[in-house]
Amino acid sequence: FEFNCTAIEVQVDPETGESAWSRWVADGRTRVTKRSDFRTVNGVRFAFLEETEGETARQAQTVTWENVTVNAGLDDARFARPSASASVVRLPAGRKATDWLAVDLHQKRYVYLRGEVNGVATDIVLDSGAGMTVLDGALAKELGLRVEGELEARGTGGNVGAGIVSGVTVKLAGMEVGPLPAAVIDLSGVGRRVGRPLPVILGKEIFHALVVDLDYPGSRIRFLDAASFRYDGPGRKLDLIPAEDGHKSLRLAIEGGEPVVVGLDTGQGGALSVFRHYADERGFLSGRPVSERRGGGVGGATTMKVATLRSVTIAGYELKGVPAAFQATDVRGAFDTKRQEGNLGAGILSRFRVLFDYGRACLWLEPGADLGAPFPKDKSGLVLGWADGALAVEFVAPGSPAAEAGWKEGERVAALDGEPATAEWGRVLTRWSEAKAGTTVRLTLADGTERVLVLKEYY
C-alpha cells in the first residue's frame, strides 16, 4: 500500500499472522526490516528482534526487546502537559521575552548571532531547516565533548555521518538553551562555500520552544515566551504545515499556479529551490535563460540549474523576478523528495520581519521597505572558495561573464576590486550581486595579473 509518497510492502504468514519482513520505499530510498525471535505474550505474538537495513551502513539498526507488556494500561500522568520547568529553554528571570539581539546577516541572508556554547564565545547560525543543533568538529574538540555513536545526517548535498554529543548548553540574548544533544559534523566545507565558518548551527529546537521574532530588515532578533505571546502587528498570517521530523512547510504560488508546499528554511541562502518533479511538471526550465551554479550544504557540493521566475506569491505578497535554483541530479539529499515542491530560503524571507509561532502553526510576515526591490543575482558567474589562506575559483557558470572571459576552475585570486582577498571575500560578491548590469569589476590573480569582468544578468 502507498501513502504520502511512501510505498510499504509487508510479508505476512497466512497461518500464524506473523509479519517477519517489510520494505519501505520513501522518495526512492529503500529500507528493509526483518523480524525474528517471535514470542507469545498474553496471547499476542511479538518479534523480540528487529533488524533494519537501508542504503548505507549508517542506516542499519538492530532493536532487541527485553520486556513486552500487553494491555497493562497507562498512567494518566504520562499524558500531562510538560511543566515550564521541563523546557530546554530558560528566558531571563521574570521575563516573557529577551531584549533585541543584533543579527549579522552574512551576505544579507545567513543569520549569524553571537553567543556562548558551554562557556566559549562563538558565532551561532540560526537554521530552521536543521533537524537538531550541530557543532563543527573543531569546536566539539575544543569543548572537550566526547562523541558517542553515529547517525546519518541528510543535507542538501547528500548524506554524511554525524557523531552525537550530549550536555550542550547555548547562551544568547540573555537566555539559556539546553542541555541539548547535538550532532557533530565537519562543517569546514560548508563554511568555505558560504564564505564564513559555521562553528554552531542552532536548529529547530529553538523554534519549537519559543516564538522567534526575526526582523531581517532591522538586522535584529528576539525570543518570546510562546504561551503568553499574542500578535497585534500589521503583518499577514501564513499557516504552517507539519513536515517530516518536526520541520515545517508552508504554501506559496509560483507564476500564478496553484499554491504548493515548500519547506521553511532560514539556513538556505537562496530565495527558492524548486524540486525536480515540480519543475518538470510546470516546465520552468523551458523558454527562459538557464545557467548553473555550485552550491550545497551538509553532505557536500551539488550543481544546480538556475533561472529567474516571473513571480512568487507568499501570504498574498507578490514578488517579481525571483532567482531560483532547480535540482539537476538526485543526490539522495534533503531536496530529493516528492513530499514537497520546493524549499523557501532566506532570499525571500529576508524581505520581511518574520515571527515564527510553531505552537500556533503559523508565521506572521511584515514586509520591509525593500519588498519590491529587484532581487540580487550573481552577475559574474564565479563561485569562489576560501581554503588554506587563499581564494580560488571552484566553479564557472555556463554563459556567464566569467565563462566568456575564459576563467578556469582552480585559478587563485589575490584581490577583488583592489581589496586583498580575505576570508570575508563574500561581502564583495554580495556587493557585485546588487550592482547594475554593465558594472566593471577587477580581479587580481596570484601572479599579479589583473582581469576585468563586465557584470551582466545571464539567467
Q: How should each PLM-predicted stretch be described?
A:
Residues 7-15, 19, 23-26, 34-459:
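Pepsin/retropepsin-fold aspartyl endopeptidases
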